[in-house]
Design a protein with these regions (language model features):
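N-terminal Sec-pathway targeting helices
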Residues: 45-64
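Hydrophobic alpha-helical membrane-insertion segments, chiefly the h-region
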Residues: 64-74
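Active-site beta->alpha N-cap acidic-glycine motif
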Residues: 78-174, 178-192, 196-197, 292
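Alpha-helical scaffold elements lining the catalytic groove of polysaccharide deacetylases
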Residues: 115-120, 169-194, 207-253, 265-272
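Structural recognition of the beta-strand scaffold that forms the well-ordered cores
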Residues: 106-108, 135-139, 160-163, 199-202, ...
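Short hydrophobic alpha-helical segments enriched in small aliphatic residues
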Residues: 11-14, 26-28, 33-38
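C-terminal domain-boundary segment and adjacent tail
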Residues: 88-101, 126-135, 145, 265-315
Length: 315
């Protein structure tokens, strides 16, 4: 037996009259799925019993290959984040804001699938287009499945769609296995409406534990929360809500703003808020444009500090 790339060659020569060669190929494109392809080549001969033995050998080889590659794959995934320090004193944190060194903000909108309010979403898209705001939409797999045409419209308008957990359980009850499964479902579902990869993951309530956060990072994704919650679900008028946002928070570079795309006042809030932020010199960017994926550290408030900014601060 010898290995070439992702393939293993196995030769069985149980008798002088027959030689059977097997090519076992493993495809690990999917992060938790292994596809094993067995191709058999045999010379002339009669020895059915020997062929059965040969097949048992290749089955065992395939099982060993699955186990071995699964270990190697997870080690490889872990290496993707080795250049980043994602914990502080053993505590993991989601990314809530970024030390950009520029006056940038990221508008994020959640689409949970609980309310089928396409009219509000379409109104929001119109406002984003008028204000020339690129945004990030965090959507559940069920919302995309139920609103496929609207999801495509979001992407065609220049926005990005990332993953939002649809789990009904609280984060303390979410297992690493359930988290991995949901990440894969989100990647596959989002992949049906856009070619842009799903690499960012959000839990609606913003509550994370170490197990979930480490699982997200290990899968090559990044947990994203927010630094400013618009509280747009409260119905006391868009103007009052924007005023409270600006009075409650002192804006910093790299703030991530949270909205609900299906909110009654969300569109109006954005139309009132953005001109004020723009006047102060802030530029709207997507989460993908703001967050760095390597060479960074985290602070206890979830602020991501790129290595370049860290050097600038202490130089």
């Amino acid at each position: 037996m010898y290995r070439s790339g992702g393939s293993f060659f196995y030769a069985s020569n149980e008798s002088n009259s027959q030689s059977v060669f097997y090519l076992v190929h493993a495809n690990t494109e999917s992060y938790n799925t292994f596809h094993i392809h067995i191709v058999k080549r045999e010379h002339r001969g009669n020895g059915c019993e020997n062929m059965k033995k040969g097949m048992w050998g290749v089955v065992i080889l395939a099982l060993v290959l699955i186990t071995g590659l699964s270990v190697f794959y997870w080690v490889d995934v872990g290496e993707k984040v080795v250049t980043a320090s994602t914990s502080v004193n053993g505590q993991e944190f989601p990314i809530c804001s970024v030390e950009t060194g520029k006056k940038q903000i990221a508008y994020t909108f959640e689409l949970s699938g609980t309310n089928q309010k396409q009219e509000q979403v379409e109104q929001l898209l119109q406002i984003l287009r008028q204000q020339e705001i690129p945004a990030t939409f965090f959507a559940t797999a069920s919302w995309i499945e139920n609103n496929r045409s609207l999801a495509i419209q979001i992407c065609q308008q220049g926005h990005e769609i990332q993953g939002l957990s649809g789990q009904e359980v609280c984060v303390e009850q979410m297992t690493a296995r359930a988290c991995r499964k949901e990440l894969q479902t989100l990647r596959e579902t989002i992949g049906t409406v856009t070619e842009e990869p799903c690499v960012f993951f959000r839990i609606p309530g913003g509550e994370y534990n170490n197990e979930v956060l480490r699982t997200v990072y290990a899968c090559g994704s990044y947990p994203v929360a927010w630094s400013i919650d618009s509280l747009d679900w409260k119905d006391y008028g868009a103007e009052n809500q924007v005023k409270q946002m600006l009075q409650t928070h002192t804006l910093r570079d790299g703030e991530i703003l949270r909205f609900h795309a299906e909110g009654e006042n969300t569109g109006e809030m954005v139309s009132l808020l953005h001109p004020q932020l723009k006047e102060e010199g802030y530029e709207a960017v997507t989460v993908s444009q703001m967050i760095v994926k390597e060479n960074y550290s985290m602070e206890t408030d979830g602020r991501q500090i790129p290595e370049s900014q860290n050097k600038a601060i202490f130089s």
